[in-house]
């Protein structure tokens, strides 16, 4: 067939680690922001050992960036760099991420708290606990802003991931916080830290909430903590199938790690089949 009159279709651009590293270290703030995201998501797929080290080093440096600031004083590049470092799994980033917990930008603190939970380094426990000082009375909305004074939801979840049993007394009062999402985070973490089913059942009851967003949040928390008694309720919950799949995958992964009896894992596989 002749090519006359047809529009040429260009080949998709194949981005590379060296290109993205150069972009991250450039001067265009929007390109740097994108590069941080890209390196966190795709950077390790093709990177050499030397490139992996360069990625981590460049992202750690980006945590101290001063060039990319919003009108309200936020640091978008720092946020993306923290998120990327959490995904990359290199504990070299822990000291710099701990320092980010002191950043004036709420969303940098939140991203750093999540990343520290993902990295699983116990050095983060005490600094994370410090953000809960003042308890529920401190955890109030900032006037005129859509967030609390501190990212307590992210902090509590990360303390659960880190197995920080020393934080149980700090976390327990947040079960009575005015925001359901914070209550859910506390229940999830306390289940992870104690194994007490009362916390899992609290989230299970939230699947009956009239608010679909709260149902989604509770469902994902149940999946993340691997709460097997919730499997059937998750299948019946009034949320989209995509959320149910994520939650059941989480429970299945936890059961496989614990070498659960075959009949339990089989029922989870059957539940997943129903959703596919």
Swiss-Prot record:
An MF annotation (GO) of this entry:
oxidoreductase activity
Subunit: CpcE and CpcF associate to form a lyase.
Function as written in the Swiss-Prot or TrEMBL entry: Required for the chromophorylation of the CpcA gene product.
**Family affiliation:** Belongs to the CpcE/RpcE/PecE family.
Q: The organism sits in which domain of life?
A: Bacteria
**Record's Gene3D superfamilies?**
Leucine-rich Repeat Variant
**Name of this protein:** Phycocyanobilin lyase subunit alpha
Q: What is its EC number?
A: 4.-.-.-
Q: Which UniProt keywords apply?
A: Antenna complex, Lyase, Phycobilisome
> InterPro entries, per this entry?
ARM-like, ARM-type_fold, PBS_lyase_HEAT
Q: Pfam families this protein is in? A: HEAT_2 (PF13646), HEAT_PBS (PF03130)
A GO CC term assigned to this protein in UniProt: phycobilisome
């Amino acid at each position: 067939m002749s090519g006359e009159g047809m529009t040429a279709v260009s080949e998709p651009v194949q981005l590379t680690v060296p290109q993205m590293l150069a972009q991250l270290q450039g001067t265009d703030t929007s390109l740097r922001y994108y590069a941080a995201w890209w390196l966190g998501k795709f950077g390790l797929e093709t990177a050499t050992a030397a490139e992996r080290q360069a990625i981590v080093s460049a992202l750690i440096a980006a945590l101290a960036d001063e060039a990319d600031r919003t009108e309200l004083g936020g640091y978008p590049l720092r946020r993306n760099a923290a998120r990327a470092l959490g995904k990359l799994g290199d504990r070299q980033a822990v000291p710099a991420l701990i320092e980010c917990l002191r950043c004036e930008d709420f969303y940098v603190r939140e991203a750093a708290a999540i990343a520290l939970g993902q990295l699983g380094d116990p050095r983060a426990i005490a600094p994370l606990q410090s953000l809960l000082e003042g308890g529920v009375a401190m955890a109030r909305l900032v006037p005129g802003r859509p967030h609390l004074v501190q990212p307590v939801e992210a902090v509590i979840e990360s303390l659960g991931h880190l197995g920080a049993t020393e934080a149980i007394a700090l976390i327990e009062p947040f079960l009575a916080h005015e925001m359901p999402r914070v209550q859910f985070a506390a229940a999830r973490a306390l289940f992870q830290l104690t194994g007490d089913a009362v916390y899992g059942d609290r989230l299970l009851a939230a699947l009956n909430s009239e608010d679909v967003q709260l149902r989604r949040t509770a469902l994902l928390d149940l999946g993340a903590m691997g709460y097997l008694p919730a499997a059937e309720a998750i299948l019946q919950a009034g949320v989209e199938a995509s959320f149910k799949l994520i939650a059941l995958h989480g429970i299945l992964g936890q059961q496989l790690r614990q070498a659960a009896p075959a009949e339990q894992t089989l029922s989870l596989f059957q539940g997943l089949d129903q959703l596919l």
